[in-house]
């Protein structure tokens, strides 16, 4: 089973007031932390979906050269998150990927173990439509989507994400993996979030 990562990095950082993925964290950047995690995982490829004008200085040179890292500027990214997701899904289709693991570039604490648990779960349940992370029964990224969902995902528009499909009776067609540590799925949206991230990284040095 071939599984790609779709790394959503085309947000407009409106709540941060500046390009949040460029913000430094030690020798890394906010946007490169989860990308490093994805590249260390068993994912076959990582499609990094960016805005067309993004010069991707936030991605370290060695990651850009990694054979699994494929940077894909999305020309319609300003039309909403669904456009970035569909850009990645189309690439997964073209490359005959059996599933796609959707990640957010602003979730710096995602671990390789989390990704591998999702991948193993999908490989153990090949007829499963999705594997989703949950916090207190709420679905959040990362989420792993079977190729059997690609057609439905390509119908999304605006700022809607895959989560809109993962509700009601459809939930019976997948698996959820509860996350008991909210820190792992923390996302950096505001200057206050960034300060929390800096403080946390300082503590764990």
Residue ranges and their predicted role:
Residues 78-149:
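Conserved beta-loop-beta/alpha segment of the NTase-like Rossmann-fold superfamily
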Residues 1-50, 55:
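N-terminal glycine-rich phosphate-binding loop and ensuing alpha1 helix
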Residues 17-20, 25-29, 75-83, 109, ...:
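Residues at secondary-structure transition points
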Residues 3, 68-70, 174:
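Short, conserved active-site loop motifs that form the nucleotide-linked donor/cofactor pocket
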Residues 25, 72-74, 133, 177-179, ...:
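Hydrophobic residues at beta-strand termini and immediately following loops
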Residues 139, 143-169:
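Short, glycine-/small-residue-rich phosphate/pyrophosphate-handling segment
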Residues 33-98:
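Conserved N-terminal catalytic core of the sugar/cofactor nucleotidyltransferase
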């Amino acid at each position: 089973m071939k599984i790609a990562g779709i790394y959503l990095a085309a947000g407009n950082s409106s709540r941060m007031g500046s390009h949040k993925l460029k913000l430094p964290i030690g020798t890394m950047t906010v946007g490169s932390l989860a990308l490093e995690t994805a590249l260390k995982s068993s994912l076959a490829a990582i499609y990094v979906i960016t805005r067309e004008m993004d010069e991707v200085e936030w991605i370290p040179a060695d990651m850009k050269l990694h054979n699994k890292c494929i940077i894909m500027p999305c020309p319609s990214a300003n039309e909403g998150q669904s456009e970035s997701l569909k850009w990645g899904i189309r690439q997964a289709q073209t490359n005959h990927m059996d599933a796609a693991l959707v990640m957010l570039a602003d979730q710096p604490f995602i671990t390789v173990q989390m990704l591998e648990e999702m991948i193993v779960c999908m490989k153990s349940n090949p007829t499963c439509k999705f594997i989703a992370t949950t916090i207190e029964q709420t679905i959040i990224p990362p989420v792993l989507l079977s190729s059997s969902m690609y057609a439905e995902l390509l119908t999304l528009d605006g700022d809607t994400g895959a989560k809109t499909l993962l509700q009601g009776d459809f939930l019976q067609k997948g698996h959820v993996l509860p996350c008991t540590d909210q820190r792992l799925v923390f996302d950096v949206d505001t200057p206050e979030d960034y300060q929390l991230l800096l403080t946390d990284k300082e503590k764990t040095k």
